[in-house]
A protein has these predicted regions:
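Solvent-exposed, non-transmembrane alpha-helical starts
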Residues: 118-122, 165, 195-196
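Short acidic, glycine-rich loop/turn motifs
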Residues: 25-27, 102-104, 160-162
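N-terminal targeting sequences that direct proteins away from the cytosol to non-cytosolic compartments
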Residues: 20-99, 116, 137, 176-178, ...
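Positively charged n-region of N-terminal signal peptides that target proteins for export
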Residues: 1-8
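Signature of long, low-cysteine stretches enriched in small and polar/charged residues
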Residues: 94-96, 128-176
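A short acidic-to-branched-hydrophobic micro-motif
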Residues: 96-125, 181
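N-terminal signal peptide c-region/cleavage motif recognized by signal peptidases
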Residues: 12-18
């Protein structure tokens, strides 16, 4: 999959680019997206119906993740196994801080950081709205809050199609006072289960350094 760099575009938009834009959530609720990253339900009664579950498992970095890749923009780092993963600054995606790839395989990742803090509860809908500008059929197949290395994150699995390619995304969304992080892996939908263990081990390397 040599064209993998093109796929970064689907989720590489900054999270905070909307000013009073109407959007439809993946569960059908209409919301107003505000410039500060918050949103308001058009129908107030629908707000109570939205519930993202919390996974009771505590996730932590793999013992084999021996290298700490530090963000230069926000106070976070990413533990990874350099024997398995190649990584570096992006060549074709100015919104990403780092790109990663499983050596010799078709699993890729992107780390997008911003200095703006965004409420964790708003990230899913904003990310979906951004992604649908390029892949209108992007939808959530799994969502939950997790505790990862002591920090609460939002975990999303998304399916979408771009240029006929069926892509699966799995990653963490995290924000603190230093900014916001999207740590996302992706591959083709038919390879998601084959690469699930590697994908989860990679994103579980996310740590707060503040």
């Amino acid at each position: 999959m040599k064209t993998y760099s093109l796929l970064f575009l689907i989720l590489s938009f900054p999270l905070c680019i909307f000013a009073q834009t109407r959007a439809i959530t993946d569960t059908g609720q209409e919301v107003m997206l505000n410039s500060d990253g918050t949103y308001t339900y058009v129908n107030k009664e629908e707000a109570a119906a939205v519930n993202i579950p919390t996974n009771s498992t505590e996730f932590s970095k793999s013992e084999s993740a021996s290298f700490l890749l530090k963000s230069k923009r926000v106070n976070v780092g990413f533990w990874l196994d350099p024997k398995l993963w190649s990584f570096g600054e992006p060549q074709d995606n100015p919104d990403a801080e780092y790109e990663v790839a499983l050596k010799g395989e078709d699993l890729y990742g992107v780390i997008i950081t911003e200095k703006i803090e965004v409420p964790l509860e708003t990230m899913k809908n904003i990310a979906l709205q951004n992604a649908r500008q390029i892949a209108p059929d992007v939808h959530v197949v799994k969502q939950e809050y997790r505790m990862v290395n002591g920090q609460k994150v939002l975990y999303l699995e998304l399916f979408g199609t771009m240029d006929g390619m069926k892509i699966a995304y799995a990653g963490y969304f995290f924000s603190n006072s230093s900014g916001t992080v999207q740590f996302i892996t992706f591959t083709s939908q038919n390879l998601l289960e084959e690469y699930r263990e590697h994908s989860q081990q990679l994103i579980n390397g996310l740590v707060s350094l503040s």
